[in-house]
Amino acid sequence: MKSVLRRVLIPIVAVVAGLLPGVVMVEQASALTKLSQAQAESLFRAVGITWSSSGGCTNRNISTCTSFAQINDTTVYGARTLKTASGCAINITGGTETGHASGTYSHWNGYKIDISKYTCVGNYIHTYFTRIANRGDGYPQWRSGSGNIYADEGSHWDITYYNCGGC
C-alpha cells in the first residue's frame, strides 16, 4: 500500500511543486520496497514475463541461479511496463543473484535485470529509446523517456531501473 501511495503522490507533488515559484525539482525519497522471490514471480507471471537460469534455481547466493529476492518493486514494475508497452516476449535471465558487477545501482541491490535478446524487444528499444554514450566497458546504451538504461551486452540486455517507467 505504501508503495502504491508513493507512486500516486510523488507525481502529484511534483506537478504542484513545479507550479510554485522558485521550485525547480522534487526528488522521490530513496526508500525502496524490496520484494520476495514469490512476490516478484507473481507480478511477472501476471503479465506473461518468464524467467530462466542455467542452474535451474533461484538461490541468491549461487551465480548460476536467477533470483528475485530483494529486488526493488520499481525494477519489477519497470519490466512489466516494458512488457506491456512493447508487446514483446520478455525472459529474465539475471536478477539479484551474486556474480554481477557491484555498485549502488547493481543487480545485487535490486536495480538491474538481464533479459534475453529477442528481436522484438531490441527493435522496441532502438525505436523508442534514445541512444546515449557507450558504457565504460564499451557496451552501447539506450535511455528510456523515464531515465532507465538499457545496455546491449551482446548476448542479453542489461537493464537498470531507476523507476517503474511510467507504471
Model-predicted segments: where are they?
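Acidic helix-start/capping segments at beta-turn-to-alpha-helix junctions
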Residues: 94-103
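Secretory targeting and sorting signals
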Residues: 1-29
